[in-house]
Amino acid sequence: MDCMYDAELVDVVKNTSNESILPILEQKINLLVSSGETKCYRTLKRILYDFVTRKHLDGIMYILDSELLTDNVIRKIDRYCILLSCKFGFVELLEYLDEIGVDILVEKIYLELIFEDSFKYSRYDHDDEYYDDHFFKSSIHYAVKYGHMNIIEYLSCKKTNADGLLSACSLKNIQLVKYFLDQQNYDDNTIYHGLRSACWNGDLEMVKYFMQYIPEDKRNNVFILDHVCEEGYFDILVYLIEQKWKIDVEFAIKQTVMGGRLEMLKYLIAQYPDSKYSVVKLIETISYCGKDETLEYLLSFEDSKLKKFIKSNKFSKLLEVVCERGYLKVFKILFHLNENVDLREAFSNACQNGHLDIVQYIISNKKEFTDKNFLENDQEHITYLTRITFAKGHLDILKCLDEIGISRSYISEYAASLVIGNGFRSKKTLECVQWLFEDEKYHKYSQAIAVKAFRYDTVSVIKYLVSVGLDIKPITNIALDYICINNNMDCLKYLIENGTDITINDNRAIKLAAQEDNIDIVKCLVENGADIRTDDDYVMKICTLRNHKVLIRYLMSLDIKEPSNESIESIEPINTIKNPNKSEKNWIKHHCESIYYTKLMDRP
């Protein structure tokens, strides 16, 4: 297999002195160019990196001045040299680039051009294939990032560069901020952006330095305060108010409440006693954020609308969200405002999101959940509650429900299988299955649960199911399909260890794994007896058709030749359907991780 750069040349250059290197380059450059743009560029990247680290400007100039390189390679190398000069403070290189007409103030240098000093590259590396603007930064950004003042000064003398100032702000470098502000003039918009960045970083010294550049009549950008209030930068808030910064008091109070900043809230209310704000809306906001101390403080204010609010549907909805997020202290405070509120949905939210403390508190304080009328007359709600809680894997809550008479009898086969893939947050997937199977009548759910376990590579559950009597043979087809589609190596190894025939259905497994570009699965199957050349080299043909480069290289290492274009025209990809084994369709349910109410309630 060919490496994507000339490793031999890179090593020679690396181990040759500056005095002896130019003759080698002169001798090798023609051959390198003839190898193609990609290999040429990737090789030169590594050579240039080495030259810059040892400040060998003559070697770099020889490459940059070469008339043999294509325009595309030259363009990439130019920008790469800009980045390296910024990274290593090689101002002589930057000056030379400027001298030969390269735009050194470029706004987009591909970020992935940076690579490790160790030169450890995968032979399958693809370091130039993605060009999303999200990964681009400017030359001045890198100059600021690496902090070489000679580079920063050289770039700054070319033009007023707002990106340099803002980069210094984001990197919290007050010395560079002072340098840029003292050396250059910026428009109001740039100054506002810099001040806001300083506020977001909580840097009071930087805020003070920016303030001297903002006239008092222009201190009116209300959005400067949003992060200050939410993050609790009290000293900056006080300073801005002292500097007569115009603020939207209602907005500032809301942001302070969202951050749970009690002392700042008290300060704002004291500073602006005549300001108007809705206590009810603030209570809703602070409850959503789970800040109990701030909530208690807000409730100390009288509000004529509060009594009406706690009897409304909005209050019930608020409790539902609080229970969903698990804010026990907030829930207790709100519950005592109206203990007659309907908590069924709130209770359900607490159960399915695993908040045992809230579940126990509701059971202790709302007797209706232990009342016979609830257990006998609200079967639909109880059924959903039990199934969704099991599907999410909250075993401690299931046991708590069992104590008040809500047993595992409500759990369907479909709900039982959902715990695989949905119970990962609780980390008790296996324990939930074991708890359910304490009653042997639920062993009939084994195959449905096992199918999901093969899909999500949950081999611990499969081993347990086998230990209590599961026969894997009826589901081998669908198990292998999921393994090959989802790259589930643990489950594949388990099947092989237990003597499963991995060549069934005309070696479908290896063909499907190749089609899905799962090289590790392909290798494992080959090592354990699968026929890599089955069906007239189907594996190589499907890899060629779908351009699976890594797999193609692996197959070529096994002396399998690439097929002709004519031979792959008629190749038919394997259809991956919801249930790969149609004969088992009646009792195996295929579904995604989403849990839908109708399916959860209707499916057996």
UniProtKB/Swiss-Prot annotation:
- Write down a Pfam family by its short name: Ank_2
- ANK repeat segments run 77-106, 135-164, 166-189, 190-219, 221-247, 248-277, 314-341, 342-371, 380-410, 445-474, 475-504, 505-534, 535-565
Q: By its UniProt entry, which InterPro entries does this protein fall under? A: Ankyrin_rpt, Ankyrin_rpt-contain_sf, SecEffector_AnkRepeat
Q: Which residues form a coiled coil?
A: none
Which keywords fit this entry according to its UniProt record?
A: ANK repeat, Repeat
Entry keyword Magnesium: no
The keyword Acetylation is annotated on this UniProt entry: no
Q: Which PANTHER family match?
A: ANKYRIN REPEAT-CONTAINING PROTEIN
For this entry, the protein name equals: Putative ankyrin repeat protein L56
Q: Which organism is it from?
A: Acanthamoeba polyphaga mimivirus
